[in-house]
Structures are given as structure tokens and as C-alpha cells.
Curated annotation (Swiss-Prot):
It is found in: Cell inner membrane. NDH-1 is composed of 14 different subunits. Subunits NuoB, C, D, E, F, and G constitute the peripheral sector of the complex. This is NADH-quinone oxidoreductase subunit D. GO terms for cellular component: plasma membrane. It is an enzyme of class 7 (translocase). HAMAP family: NDH1_NuoD. The gene is nuoD. Keywords: Cell inner membrane, Cell membrane, Membrane, NAD, Quinone, Translocase, Transport, Ubiquinone. NCBIfam families: NuoD, PRK06075.1. One of its GO terms (molecular function) is NADH:ubiquinone reductase (non-electrogenic) activity. The keyword Membrane applies. Its main location: membrane. InterPro entries: NADH_Q_OxRdtase_suD, NADH_UbQ_OxRdtase_49kDa_CS, NDH1_su_D/H, NiFe-Hase_large. It catalyses: a quinone + NADH + 5 H(+)(in) = a quinol + NAD(+) + 4 H(+)(out).
């Protein structure tokens, strides 16, 4: 009699639900998954090696391109590692700006996660709504850095420049009528802080809108409740962090447990799940929208009342002001030296971690006293989550695999590095 064997199937890398270039080799018994073997490396760009041949400052833009959905948070961990080795004091205003943009980035990340996760499961409306809000947040990125995504805004010792006093305005064109432009520029009459404040006032209603569409939706619950269950013990053993760990009921958040920058001065809560399934992880991230909004509001209030420097006064690390360079030759030479040769970091090693939207994002930096890192190791949260995919999907149907990949919020820029 012929032997009955499991069916082997390729999932991805050209699959709309693969979230990038994920290739899974699935072993199936009928439509039930027996084993899921992730094959990674299709987006490997050698970031860790590239950083060894670039000055410390030149590697900042590489960080944006790791998890290309949470740009500024990646930069944050990198500059914090450099600051640890240098023993640099970051001005308080710069710390508040960093925290504010970290939370803006968290909302940006979760909006894309929500839209893509819902679209994978079959709910299209949320995807369109999420991109409407992302547009406003990209405008905030653009106002401070000139780039809508890869900002390269953080610097060792602070940030590139202070927040602008006025927002860029839309102009009339062949595709935008006078009425359209007037409507678009309505909330752009003030400063960037006014624009962000206007967004934070509108955003809670948008979150309620997403919840109306999904939270009590019968089909959404059927597709997510009891799917991809991870117990608290297994979540910790598998190295999960962020919403994946908190969804299983473990209240671990670096912003509370190991506060960095000014998080210990701010008032916010850490949402946790109960059952550790896709639905609980969805609820955790939805509540994170509201908590991030709370943090941004507190940062706006503080930044309005406290002007000041936004980068360290250590001239070995920070460039001279642009106004000075226009009439002082010494300042121009100083600027040129800083951006060609770079600054030297004392020999030693440091690990800096931030609460990234996906989990704990860490940078382990080793310096040999040169102007380039001797070794840069990136701890990507998605890497540990993808490693747990096999365990999470066993016994589930192929259709549930799509929901589990969505709940993990995988981005291959950071996994393949």
C-alpha cells in the first residue's frame, strides 16, 4: 500500500500576505499546518557590516532603513548607544522632542499594522482609513527633516534642529483647486506643535472608528479569537517582546521598567492582554494608540513652555550653528572636519535598547577608539517573533497562518538586516 505523506507547500515570497519577502515552507496534513519553516535572507543588505566602514554619523540613515515603518525609533537606539560610550548629556528639550517623535512613530507603525492585518483577514475599509491618518504624521516628519519616511533626524547629543515655527502650505496646482488647497491648509496655519496638537485632538475619534469596524465584528472575532495562542511562560521563553509579550499578559515595557529619556516624567499606562491570542494582541495595540496620544499631548505642553537647546554643546560631536558658518571660517572648517572625518568614540562597549513599536529594539556597539564602530549588533524584535511562528501555527489552518503573520507585525528590513 502506498505511504501517505504530508504535503509540502511554498508560501511566499511573492504573496500579498507575506508582509515583504517572507518564504515559508509549509508541511500540511490536508489544510492543517504540521510545520512552518521560515526561510529568511531575501532582504539582507549587510547593515551591520556596512556600519563598520562608515563614521558614526554616516550610519544614522542606515537605521531608518532597518524597520522602514518605525524609522525614528531605530535611530533612537543607535544614537543612545553612541551617547552611552561618549558619556554625552542630551538637552532636556531634545529628549522631549525624541519621545514625542517616538510616539508619533509608534502610531505610524500601528496604523500600518492595523490596516495590513485587517486587509489580510478581509476587512478593506480600515486599511483606507489608516492611510488617511498616516498622511498627517508623515507631514510632521517632513516638517522637521525634509523627508517623509527616512528622516535621519536624531543625532548623537540631540536632534538635527528645533521644531519649525510654521508648517509648509499646499499650493494651488492642476490637481488641486483653490477650495481644496484652502481646506488642506486649514490646520497648517500655526507651528508644527499646533499641527500635532490638532491631530491629537482628532485622533481618539479615529481610534473609536476603527474599533466600531472591528472590535465587536463577528467575522473579525471568528478569525482572531483563540488563534495563535501563546502562554506567558512560552512568550518569555521564545524571547518575545512588545505587544506580542504584553498580549500574553506580561506587563513588560522598557518605557516603564527601564525608563530612558523622559519617560519617567510622563503619565501613561501599559495595556496587557489575558488570553495571548491574535484578538488580545489587537486590543493591546489599539490601546497603545490612546496611550501614545496621551504621551504626545504631555510632550506638546512641556515643549510650548520650555524653549532651549536641542543638541549638546559638546563641539567635538555637535556641528556649529549654520548662521555661524556663514561668517566664520573656523566654524566652516569645524563643520567640514566633523562630517568628513567624524568624531572619535572612546574604546568600550555599550548596549542601548528602546521600546520599539514591535518590541525591544537594541543596538550593541563596540568601539576601539576610532571614528567608526568596531562592531555593531542589531537586536531586532521581529527576528524572535518569526522564530516562534512554527510553534504558533501548528494545528491551525492555512487561512489562520495569514492572521498569525499579521499579528506578529513582521517587517523584513530589520529581520534580514
Amino acid at each position: 500500500m502506498a505511504e501517505i505523506r504530508n504535503y509540502t507547500m511554498n508560501f511566499g515570497p511573492q504573496h500579498p500576505a507575506a508582509h515583504g519577502v517572507l518564504r515559508l515552507v509549509l508541511e500540511l496534513d490536508g489544510e492543517v499546518i504540521q510545520r512552518a519553516d521560515p526561510h529568511i535572507g531575501l532582504l539582507h543588505r549587510g547593515t551591520e557590516k556596512l556600519a563598520e566602514n562608515r563614521t558614526y554619523l554616516q550610519s544614522v540613515p542606515y537605521m531608518d532603513r532597518l524597520d522602514y515603518v518605525s524609522m525614528m525609533v531605530n535611530e533612537h537606539a543607535y544614537v543612545m548607544a553612541i551617547e552611552k560610550l561618549l558619556g554625552l548629556e542630551v538637552p532636556l528639550r531634545a529628549q522631549y522632542i525624541r519621545v514625542m517623535f517616538d510616539e508619533i512613530t509608534r502610531i505610524l507603525n500601528h496604523l500600518l499594522w492595523l490596516g495590513a492585518h485587517a486587509l489580510d483577514v478581509g476587512a478593506m475599509t480600515v486599511f483606507l482609513y489608516a492611510f488617511r491618518e498616516r498622511e498627517d504624521l508623515f507631514d510632521c516628519y517632513e516638517a522637521v527633516s525634509g523627508a517623509r519616511m527616512h528622516a535621519a533626524y536624531y543625532r548623537p547629543g540631540g536632534v538635527y534642529r528645533d521644531l519649525p515655527d510654521r508648517m509648509p502650505q499646499y499650493e494651488e496646482s492642476t490637481v488641486r483647486s483653490k477650495e481644496d488647497v484652502k481646506q488642506l491648509n486649514e490646520n497648517r496655519q500655526g507651528s508644527l506643535l499646533d499641527f500635532i496638537e490638532d491631530f491629537t485632538n482628532r485622533f481618539p475619534a479615529y481610534v473609536d472608528e476603527y474599533e466600531t469596524l472591528l472590535t465587536d465584528n463577528r467575522i473579525w472575532k471568528q478569525r482572531t479569537v483563540g488563534i495563535g495562542v501563546v502562554s506567558p511562560e512560552r512568550a518569555m521563553a521564545l524571547g518575545m517582546t512588545g505587544p506580542m509579550l504584553r498580549g500574553s499578559g506580561v506587563a513588560w515595557d522598557l518605557r516603564k521598567k527601564q525608563p530612558y529619556e523622559v519617560y519617567d516624567r510622563l503619565d501613561f499606562d501599559i495595556p496587557i492582554g489575558v488570553n495571548g491570542d491574535c484578538y488580545d494582541r489587537y486590543l493591546v495595540r489599539i490601546e497603545e494608540f490612546r496611550q501614545s496620544n496621551r504621551i504626545i499631548k504631555q510632550c506638546i505642553d512641556w515643549l510650548r513652555k520650555n524653549p532651549g537647546p536641542v543638541i549638546s554643546d559638546n563641539t567635538k560631536v555637535a556641528p556649529p550653528p549654520r548662521e555661524e558658518m556663514k561668517h566664520d571660517m573656523e566654524a566652516l572648517i569645524h563643520h567640514f572636519k566633523l562630517f568628513t572625518e567624524g568624531f572619535h568614540v572612546p574604546a568600550g562597549e555599550a548596549y542601548a535598547a528602546v521600546e520599539h513599536p514591535k518590541g525591544e529594539f537594541g543596538i550593541y556597539l563596540i568601539s576601539d577608539g576610532a571614528n567608526k564602530p568596531y562592531r555593531l549588533k542589531i537586536r531586532a524584535p521581529g527576528f524572535a517573533h518569526l522564530a516562534a511562528l512554527d510553534e504558533m501555527t501548528r494545528g491551525h489552518m492555512i487561512a489562520d497562518l495569514v492572521a498569525i503573520i499579521g499579528t506578529q507585525d513582521i517587517v523584513f528590513g530589520e529581520i534580514d538586516r
